[in-house]
Amino acid sequence: MQREEKQMDMLLEAVLNRLNDLKHSIGAMIHRLETEYETINWPTFLDNFALISGHLTGLSKILSSEIGTPLRNLTVLPLLLTPERDEALLQLTEGRIPIFSHDLVPDYLRTKPDPGAESRMAAHEAKANNLQPDTAAKQVAQYNKVISHVWDIVSKAREEWDTEASSRPGIQQTSSLADTQALVAAVGVGNGLTMPVGPGGVPNAGIMIPPAIRQASPMSAVSPGAGPLGKMPSGIKTNIKSANQVHPYR
């Protein structure tokens, strides 16, 4: 009897250790997804998932081993039920179970599905067992036909994409490096821009125009009454009369 109790303690300790490792791995993965969702890469995610899968596999091996009495042959019975808050139970369960009352015991110690879920599951199983073999075979054949058709469509689309990608010479360039460098030089250091000359031969430091506009309106073609240098010449002709003429309607 003492040997079986010792084996049971060893089994429970191994299960608890594996459960703690599994809990820490899941918590670390959730924390990483919440805090590093912008920088986490796929290999790191797969490594964390593989670690969780390894803990689950180890837990399954421990539970399936024949060390001592199998846990499935044991029954868990509550020794104390109270509707009041139990601080020791809250600390033992890490804040998950504050009360161990008559209403909560069936949910916490349940080893079978809920009665409603169990009845629905039994109804589905009975419906599946009453299905005729010919009808089941026809449904399976139709299902396989649909899957094959979808597989053919996906395979054809993949072949077309691969062919198009292999025949494509490369990404077409949509910008000019020389124009970009010239624009950056003009904006940054004023390369290619000239400073216009204002009235009296004084340079106008507030306006800088490109050479093309400056050549289109040379100083020799500007009349004395025209505006400042740098404006495009107007195509409207005006007739300015002298101020000493008498207005006809006065």
Curated annotation (Swiss-Prot):
Q: Name one GO molecular function term.
A: transcription coregulator activity
Main localization is nucleus
Signal peptide positions (record): none
Keywords on record: Activator, Nucleus, Transcription, Transcription regulation
Q: What is this protein called?
A: Mediator of RNA polymerase II transcription subunit 8
Q: Which GO terms describe its biological process?
A: regulation of transcription by RNA polymerase II
UniProt xrefs under Gene3D superfamilies: 1.20.58.1710
**Which family is it part of?**
Belongs to the Mediator complex subunit 8 family.
Q: Which GO terms describe its cellular component?
A: core mediator complex; mediator complex
Question: Function, please?
Answer: Component of the Mediator complex, a coactivator involved in the regulated transcription of nearly all RNA polymerase II-dependent genes. Mediator functions as a bridge to convey information from gene-specific regulatory proteins to the basal RNA polymerase II transcription machinery. Mediator is recruited to promoters by direct interactions with regulatory proteins and serves as a scaffold for the assembly of a functional preinitiation complex with RNA polymerase II and the general transcription factors.
User: Segment Disordered: which positions?
Assistant: 217-250
Task: State where composition is biased (Polar residues).
Answer: 236-250
According to the entry, what is the taxonomic lineage of the organism? Eukaryota, Metazoa, Ecdysozoa, Arthropoda, Hexapoda
The gene is: MED8
Instruction: Tell me the subunit arrangement.
Output: Component of the Mediator complex.
Superkingdom in the source lineage = Eukaryota
Compartments, record wording = Nucleus
